[in-house]
């Protein structure tokens, strides 16, 4: 290697990127007998530019993929683009450009950016979810799910984003705002299609146990809470005669669900959600005065965020229920804190033992009756006591502990036919209808004769029309002059297409399985079974924790649905999950609005992709937040220059030199030990901890140790190994130097030599009467007599003139001398 050569990152990186892609070095092999690793980072939305969060995500995945390739695994490491979605329509309005053109121009640009970072993605399996072929199979799944009863249509109160003019699933509402645009969400009644995810609620919950130790505990807990399983008693509260008559006999009562049936004697009111059917009936009746109706309507008009932020509020509805055990009248209120979509939208309120009920009762002067004695035997009347204890003031269950009391009440209700034991879930079916253009059309036809009819599969894909006008007002497909008009696939009569498109989370709920299918079969089938059975499930999935109850839950649901439809084999899509932390600058998440964005292109142009990758993986463990640091980027660049300069001193070799370790001097032995320590660290990092920063630090220490000695063979061996260890992290410079020195023969599985960890000498402490007085170095195989003699010599001034009563040698650690006098 020329002594005057300089590290030219741009030249080297362009060269190797062309070689890798020309040779197809990142394509998975078709040999399904090989051990495999499927490494997948969450694919990006094609917004136009990648950001540092992408760089971090894909640097982690790429390091893993490269490590496993050179360690004899067949590796699938694909990338694609989650390319449907609202931003394309917003761009169409703002820039007067078609969403399709905007999207695919962005994809082309982002592909170049990803390539410029040297990521080892499969070219042949790259896809965009807006491709018609992808839409075809997604529509096919929809039809099969419809036929299996896993899709249904209904009108319901939905989350509506006024800004994006579309419906949102519960999971897409964050603190009362749209997850995408951040604007407030309101409630509207709207017809739409729903995936029956609740049919899989129990399995989704139970299978989380199989992910323990493989997924972050926080993600598992978030999904458990979102699914929200609770068991209790469902029973009917009956209206008293006067209230029933006032409602015109339309209702005799309604169902209530409680997880604390033991507190039933403490009920002082019943609370309904503002959307409850009884409340709606009262709004159109003469029972309530105009003031009460106006207040209820004001609550209805509040967004979920406003209701949660508000003080407890409500309206007495001028009707009463009858207590199922005492037959006493119980007032019925509408309350702003009751959710319409949990249980039946009605609760029995027990103020003494539920804090929300307590706050409401305190505000409106409703009775607060204690029916559970705390275990410590005294009440705190300033708040609700929700703890378990002993039932009191409850004739049927006085003296029973809470668990026994709950069981006794449930048995009483079931025996008398008053109610039943049920399990409820907070999880709600997934509303997938979106009133936008740039999405996968729902393959349904509305026929005046046949009703709702799924499209014939041979007509798929139902493609989007190109000749649309995006104004931001209403649904472009519904306004299209011809696209929606068709023939009924069942009777041939004139019919109308469904003009809603699918939630874009549908696309990201199965893309991982599409990647796992041999791309040569993509035209003929959704999944090639042989290929999918080999590659699935994903061995390592990488992405942000913000997807814990959106994408990750939906993907698990889709995996189970596709399994039950016969497409897939596994119960879970992702065997292991790594959630990387955010990239911060000045302590805040990078964003254009904060003016603290670092453009990856700027870093690549100035320092090179390897510097960017090295900094990203060295600055912090992947699970932690990463604080951008310009001086640390400079430091990463300096290290790569040191690596380049070291290469000028290395002799060319295609094999590791044979070294007699025993014949080496102290510095040479130390250098070999540091190199093999780094090799050990590499195996630990890639297979267990993902703490790439510790591996990089170990390589830096090893390079320093090599520089501190001048044995050519030790240098050659050490550099041979260090380039191997760094290749997954800084692949361009590692390949360039390896080709020059070792013809890339070092990029293979390396064995650890245990002999280098055997120390020739050991350090021993010497204590006199328990106090440390000295430390000395001695041959590791020295006899005990030699050890004791040397120890006594090292503390001569502490034992001079004194009698040694006892000599204690703890091998390899210390010598303790007990003296007197």
Swiss-Prot record:
Its EC number is 6.1.1.4. GO terms for molecular function: aminoacyl-tRNA deacylase activity; ATP binding; leucine-tRNA ligase activity. Pfam families: Anticodon_1, tRNA-synt_1_2, tRNA-synt_1g. GO terms for biological process: leucyl-tRNA aminoacylation. A motif ('HIGH' region) lies at residues 44-54. It comes from the Bacteria. It is an enzyme of class 6 (ligase). ATP binds at residue 592. CDD domains: Anticodon_Ia_Leu_BEm (cd07958). One of its GO terms (cellular component) is cytosol. Belongs to the class-I aminoacyl-tRNA synthetase family. HAMAP family: Leu_tRNA_synth_B. PANTHER family: LEUCINE--TRNA LIGASE, MITOCHONDRIAL, LEUCYL-TRNA SYNTHETASE. This is Leucine--tRNA ligase.
